Design a protein with these regions (language model features):
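Conserved SAM-binding loop
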Residues: 74
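Class I S-adenosyl-L-methionine
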Residues: 1-60, 66, 169-178, 189-298
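Short alpha-helix immediately C-terminal to the canonical SAM-binding loop
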Residues: 71
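SAM-dependent nucleic-acid methyltransferase catalytic core
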Residues: 2-25, 31, 35, 78-192, ...
């Protein structure tokens, strides 16, 4: 399926914040999508910033995450948005309620799906940096999120929602026409991700799974020597980029955070195929390609 670069249009915002969310990089990621594919699989879904920014088309779409509470929330947003809003409407932004909801979820108490989703969403919204563990103590009106939930419910109607291990998911959905976008837990950052096992995320296992696929993949990671070494393989493109660091902005204005975009295809192919490039406001097509190629390390 052919894609064109664009900004706005069918794009919507995510209905939630998330640790490592790709709001700041969504344009950069989407600009590097392959030109043709029929299956889009988001392996580490999180807040879904890339999926929600991607224009819906005729391709088969999959959203996956290993976090069962997160997947239940997505399913309730898609299938029971009104019931979810009713549960959320009178939830208090208080430390006492926050600790109660956290205890109920951590103890795996038997809860109706919608209530469990509401508890988890409240933990995300009322926690510090959306980490779900520490009460944020910041004012937040829950009903301000209701339009976002409604928009997300519409966008998710034709999306398959999975709750699988990343390697098993990749093997299940791999086809020559498949495109996998992967935003795994970053290296040496396991402590910030709720559903990572005590042994830590298996970065080497993900490499092995991706190198053997028939389709294409695009991977976002923190820029570090260990990840560069893991993906230093023939046919793999490693591109260094940077974004504003949201947390560091509080202490150092303009602080940049280095990231990597890793793929098994030429990420400039979509830009080369476009007559009009609307993701970029001040550069013509040749300037964009020159700038992109300059930072490629093949």
């Amino acid at each position: 399926m052919r894609r064109r670069l664009r900004k706005g249009g069918d794009s919507i915002n995510s209905f939630m914040a998330w640790v490592g969310g790709k709001k700041a990089l969504r344009d950069e990621v989407l600009a590097r999508f392959p030109r043709n594919y029929k299956r889009y699989i988001e392996v580490f879904g999180g807040a879904g910033w890339v999926l929600f920014h991607k224009p819906p088309g005729n391709d088969f779409e999959v959203f996956n995450d290993f976090n069962g509470n997160l997947v239940n929330l997505y399913r309730c947003v898609r299938e029971q948005p009104e019931a979810l809003r009713d549960e959320l409407r009178y939830m208090l932004n208080s430390r006492l309620d926050f600790e109660y909801m956290k205890q109920m979820l951590h103890s795996k108490a038997v809860l109706p799906d919608v209530r469990r989703a509401a508890y988890y969403y409240a933990l995300i919204r009322y926690s510090y940096a959306a980490g779900t563990s520490s009460f944020g103590g910041q004012p937040h009106a829950m009903w301000n999120n209701f339009p976002l939930i409604e928009s997300a419910a519409g966008r998710l109607q034709k999306v398959v929602i999975e709750n699988k291990d990343c390697v098993k998911l990749i093997r299940q959905y791999d086809r020559p026409e498949s495109f996998f976008y992967c935003d795994p837990p970053y290296y040496n950052a396991d402590q910030y991700y709720e559903a990572v096992s005590e042994d830590g995320f298996d970065h080497a296992g993900l490499v092995d799974a991706l190198l053997g696929i028939k389709g294409k993949f695009l991977l976002s990671y923190n820029d570090c020597p260990e990840i560069r070494a893991l993906y230093d393989r023939p046919g793999i493109v490693v591109e260094g980029i940077s974004r504003l660091s949201n947390i560091a902005q509080r202490y150092e204005n303009g602080k940049q955070y280095p990231e990597l975009l890793i793929s098994n295809y030429d990420t400039t192919e979509l830009a080369r195929s476009c007559v009009q490039l609307t993701l970029f406001d001040r550069l013509d097509s040749q300037e964009i390609l020159n700038e992109r190629i300059l930072y490629h390390e093949i």
